Curated annotation (Swiss-Prot):
This is Large ribosomal subunit protein uL24. One of two assembly initiator proteins, it binds directly to the 5'-end of the 23S rRNA, where it nucleates assembly of the 50S subunit. One of the proteins that surrounds the polypeptide exit tunnel on the outside of the subunit. PANTHER family: MITOCHONDRIAL RIBOSOMAL PROTEIN L24. NCBIfam families: rplX_bact. Belongs to the universal ribosomal protein uL24 family. It comes from the Bacteria. Keywords: Ribonucleoprotein, Ribosomal protein, RNA-binding, rRNA-binding. GO terms for molecular function: rRNA binding; structural constituent of ribosome. One of its GO terms (cellular component) is ribonucleoprotein complex.
Length: 102
């Protein structure tokens, strides 16, 4: 069971965007794509056949999963634990003990 999932609210712990909060939009193997965080400018070549105009675009790049933490109800970073409830695994926040949605 993955500890961080799509839709979780997270905060960056390191890097140039340290302290910024966002929502996970995609989970890759060991990386997360977070909305509005780690945005880089990429150059795109024009492709008239596909209807793409060239130029600079803003692209959200992935962040390693070790550099983020889930945000608890108080807005503070928290680690995520897994416990068994009625024979099923349930994610919970270690700071408050609150359970996270499935």
């Amino acid at each position: 069971m993955k500890k961080i999932r799509k839709g979780d609210s997270v905060v960056l712990l390191t890097g140039r965007d340290k302290g910024k909060q966002g929502t996970v939009t995609a989970v890759l193997e060991n990386k997360l794509v977070i909305e509005g965080v780690n945005i880089y400018k990429k150059s795109v070549k024009p492709n008239p056949a596909a209807g793409v105009t060239g130029g600079m675009i803003d692209k959200t790049m992935p962040v390693h999963i070790s550099n983020v933490a889930v945000v608890d109800g108080n807005g503070k970073p928290s680690r995520v634990g897994i416990k068994l409830v009625d024979g099923k695994k349930q994610r919970f926040l270690k700071t408050t003990g609150a359970t996270l949605s499935a």
